Amino acid sequence: MIEKNYQPADIESRMSRVWEESGAFKAGRPERRDAAPFTIVIPPPNVTGSLHMGHALNNTLQDILCRFERMRGRDVLWQPGTDHAGIATQMVVERQLMERQEPSRREMGRAKFLERVWQWKAESGGTIINQLKRLGASCDWSRERFTMDEGLSRAVVKVFVELHREGLIYKDKRLVNWDPKLLTAISDLEVQQVEVKGHLWYLRYPIEGRAFSPDDPASFIVVATTRPETMLGDTAVAVHPDDERYSALVGSHVILPLVGRRIPIVADDYSDPEKGSGAVKVTPAHDFNDFEIGKRHGLPQISVLDQEGKLSLVGNEDYLRGLPEGALQFAEEFHGVERFAARKQIVARLEDFGFLEKIEPNTHMVPHGDRSGVVIEPFLTDQWYVDAKTLAQPAVAAVRAGETSFVPKNWEKTYFEWMENIQPWCISRQLWWGHQIPAWYGPDGKVFVAETEEEAVGNALGYYVEQEVITPEQGHDMAEDPAKREGFITRDEDVLDTWFSSALWPFSTLGWPDETPELQRYYPTDTLVTGFDIIFFWVARMMMMGLHFTKEVPFSTIYMHALVRDEKGAKMSKSKGNVIDPLHLVDEYGADALRFTLAAMAAQGRDIKLSTQRVDGYRSFATKLWNACRFAEMNGAALTAGFDPTSVKETLNRWIMHETTLAAREVTEAIEAYRFNDAAGAVYRFVWNVFCDWYVELTKPLLMGEDGPAKTETRAMIAWVRDEILKLLHPFMPFITEELWDVTAKRDGLLVLAPWPRKPRALTPEQIATLSLAGPTDALIPPVIGTFEDDTEEEFSDPEAEAEIGWVVDLVSAIRSVRAEMNIPPSTLTPLVLVDVSDETKARGQRWNDVAKRLARLADISFADAAPEGAVQLLVRGEVAALPLKGVIDLAAERARLEKEIAKADADIKRVDAKLSNEKFVANAPEEIVEEEKEKREAALERKAKILEALERLKKAS
């Protein structure tokens, strides 16, 4: 018995328990031993995370695919797990220690701190997993993995050691994104570009051999910079090769102000003649672009900042080399000054000596750490790197060969551009939480990389005995007693970038490096669903690692979904206060409503503009389905044993059979093509418009009539269509559909494991004989009902039934549309004249007379050779239907009203056009505001077109 009111919270809680207790989501079910596998690996959320709208979209789409393929009979593995999230987790635990006034990380030491992190993970690390379950994610939760669990850690170490042995992992001194607060290198993804209202300082660099005078432009070259504090590390001035202003100076030198360093003027394409003075200072140790210029011209790299962002000048040999004697005093004065304080002091000193030409306001993007909030420094430091260029080549070739494809396809271009210009990947982080790098150092700095400490120590001691640094006896003692080798062999303290372990996720979660049965069955995976923002950080690296270590692509399809924005199209951010919490929406509207909203709006390549009104609308859709199932139940709709939907006699029932087949095909093809919005739209239209609005409405005369066989057939057909709807809708709205499946009949299995609708066929006599002969309300619906032929069978189709019922639907719809356009009150009945129609249409008009009158608010239906005067004419399937409105409404007043509406629409269009033609508005307004104005224009044009159509009808009637 279906409850009167739809209560999502109660249903979701109950169905979650049912699924978990039944093991419905488990891969490797015995009955699917011979089924084709279908594998998706979840993009592992941070263990510190809480569900945000990006997670909700990403996991809804994955779940749609998994539930769809599971219902199609495949052995589905949706592999869940979480990422250890190095910086994020370490910060959470450090903050907790501070709040509890406990010893800091450094005070307690590495071992004890890591114990605390594992303790935190055990207590709080499951939050996001439970939230994903609330969303309805049908992962095989029994296989949950963590990027630092024992098996995955073994895979990480093996990969590092093998890549190092192959020369693909190495140590190098390069620029990295350095966080001066967290004191670690961070990835590009952890850098936020923030628009800052700053300044552009124009500095005078004296030309060597000329007497410097601020009043003599020939004695200096002007460079423009946003970072005057880094000028202390300048090693060149660059000008464009084609800039005639400076062509005579290329090859000469300038003297660096305040410092006295002699640096060359070089010609380089990076310099922009149109920007600033056209000459730029080159600081290879403090700017990524300058680093590349420095490599092209063989310039020294002089770092003038320390890890905390303070000037480091005293004792800095690179800085002091070649400077005049007086430079040491300056170095002592500025040494240890914080970078932004140093900026002010250096600018003041430059001004004092006449080296400051001018200062201009300058709004520009400045990199900030997304977790620390401080300005990030390009910092020259020794780090571990992966030779990404070598690993990228097979990954590019695989996509070009079609082994892996992107959906939408345009993302392939982005992938190729990045992969073909890929830089070395910095994989070391100055943290404690993470996979510690398996490298050990001897007393002379020689590196020993090995899978275990024992192996590294053995290799190191053997080497130093051979080099006669230690005696064989000392080597033996050190091997036996760790205390004796303390300080002689030390492990690298750094940990690996979190993305390093994530890059192995598709195969490490299945047991690699062991050849496990799971690895053989479920790898390569089928589809990766992910956001475009991690195409480089994760997707590309999984491709590289998967191909290198398994010789196979990790997935055949990569579906890139777009962003979820607010209803105006703005990116969600805490600072804007426009973040929508998916769990709040789940609490208020139910998980099914949120899931359906996200699917319905997930058009390929288009960002989602999410509004609570849309979610509320799909909550109403769920209620509509609930009430339709209650209607079916109250009218005795039930599947009887042996019912064959292809053998129904009633035209209406054959029509709904035809429409159900079309809907099933449309939904199936759309999901297969990753057109989630089209699939959701198709099932929505079928449920709301076809089933609820038309079929249910049109069955009422049959259900209330005296024709027993027709009534019995219709009840069974309603139940059959209801079940097909529950199947089609299940991937999108799993909770409500599973609940309705459970309460509408006695079943022998869950909907989540029921077969997906395909092409219905009649049951054989033998199959019918095996069915229960109990009454319709007590019948156990066996799995054979709703079983399907393979795709070679001809699809059910009934053009005659479609022509008959489709005519009724089109006629009533057209009349309702005109009544709405003309403001005809619902209480006013209008006559209908079918004009010069065929005998077939005349017969239809007579057969459906009562239904059409009731649904279209008609006084009567008549037939004539010509349309009466004052009638609005409608074209219904190529024939004319006329609505005489003379005397029903004031035609002149209605015409005036419509003309007024057109004028209003024109005014709206004119107002928007004025905005969009204003170059200042388009250039300065936020992108989402401009987009909103364009949408307003489209809506006004559409509204105007409809009013013009109505006005044209009215003119003809007049």
Where do the protein language model's features map onto the residues?
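N-terminal, positively charged nucleic-acid-binding surface of large information/translation enzymes
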Residues: M1-D242, T283-R296, P300-D318, R343, ...
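Conserved short loop/turn motifs at secondary-structure junctions
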Residues: K4, G81-H84, F113-W118, S142-S153, ...
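NTP-handling and nucleic-acid-processing catalytic cores
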Residues: K4-Y6, R14-S16, C66, R134, ...
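Acidic, turn-prone loop/beta-hairpin segments
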Residues: D83, P180, I186-Q192, Y441, ...
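Core structural elements
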Residues: E123-K133, R371, S620-E633, N653-A663, ...
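Conserved phosphate-binding loops in nucleotide/dinucleotide-binding enzymes
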Residues: V194, V282-A285, E377, F488-D494, ...
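Catalytic adenosine-cofactor/nucleotide-binding cores of aminoacyl-tRNA synthetases and other
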Residues: D370-S372, V564-K568, M572-E650, A745-L751, ...
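C-terminal low-complexity, glycine/proline- and small-hydrophobic-enriched intrinsically disordered tails
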Residues: D616, A745-S958
